[in-house]
């Protein structure tokens, strides 16, 4: 009986050690890049829900609030109405909001956009390549991109209306 218990403990210890070792190995050798503040934002091309092409480099000369989100993400859901409310005011001032969904179905994203009557461009990051390029963890994560196309700040987590407005002011050309 004691032999079985000892064997069981050794097996559990080996499994846990292997899991910890694998996690450390993955973290150390991960190829994902971390977005560098002050560097040019990586360009991307997506198609929004209305079929229009969105290419980041086309927004040079404007500030860009790039938001990564998901329909299942409660903090994302809370901040979207604030973004929608502030969008017309800051669009007139040369700021664009682009919301990139984290690889969900078209129907889920379209239903969400319709439910909240979102006015800013929304696209789906099919395959999650843009999220990988920008090193996004967790959702929501947003990037402030200035008129020269440089990333000036990364914002993780849900934002209040007041915080969003401060960020939009920061990237107003």
UniProtKB/Swiss-Prot annotation:
InterPro entries: AhpC/TSA, Thiol-dS_OxRdtase_ResA, Thioredoxin-like_sf, Thioredoxin_domain, Thioredoxin_ResA/DsbE_sf. It is a single-pass type II membrane protein. Disulfide bonds join 73-76. It holds the Pfam family AhpC-TSA. Residues 35-173 form the Thioredoxin domain. One of its GO terms (molecular function) is antioxidant activity. Gene3D superfamilies: Glutaredoxin (3.40.30.10). GO terms for cellular component: plasma membrane. Keywords: Cell membrane, Cytochrome c-type biogenesis, Disulfide bond, Membrane, Oxidoreductase, Redox-active center, Signal-anchor, Transmembrane, Transmembrane helix. It is found in: Cell membrane. The chain crosses the membrane at residues 10-29. GO terms for biological process: cytochrome complex assembly. Pathway: Protein modification; cytochrome c assembly. PANTHER family: THIOL:DISULFIDE INTERCHANGE PROTEIN DSBE (PTHR42852:SF6). Thiol-disulfide oxidoreductase which is required in disulfide reduction during c-type cytochrome synthesis. May accept reducing equivalents from CcdA, leading to breakage of disulfide bonds in apocytochrome c; following this reduction heme can be covalently attached. Belongs to the thioredoxin family. ResA subfamily. HAMAP family: ResA. This is Thiol-disulfide oxidoreductase ResA. The lineage of its organism: Bacteria, Bacillati, Bacillota, Bacilli, Bacillales.
């Amino acid at each position: 009986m004691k032999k079985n218990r000892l064997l069981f403990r050794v097996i559990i210890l080996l499994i846990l050690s292997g899991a910890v070792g694998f996690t450390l190995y993955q973290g150390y050798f991960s190829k994902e890049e971390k977005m560098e503040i002050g560097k040019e934002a990586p360009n991307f091309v997506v198609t929004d829900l209305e079929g229009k092409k969105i290419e980041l480099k086309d927004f040079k000369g404007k500030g860009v609030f790039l938001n990564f989100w998901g329909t299942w993400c409660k903090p994302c859901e809370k901040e979207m109405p604030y973004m929608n409310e502030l969008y017309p005011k800051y669009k007139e001032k040369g700021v664009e909001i682009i919301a990139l969904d984290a690889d969900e179905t078209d129907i889920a994203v379209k239903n969400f956009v319709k439910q909240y009557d979102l006015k800013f461009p929304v696209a789906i990051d099919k395959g999650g390549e843009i999220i990988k390029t920008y090193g996004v963890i967790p959702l929501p994560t947003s990037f402030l991109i200035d008129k020269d196309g440089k990333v000036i700040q990364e914002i993780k987590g849900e934002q209040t209306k007041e915080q969003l407005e401060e960020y939009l002011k920061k990237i107003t050309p």
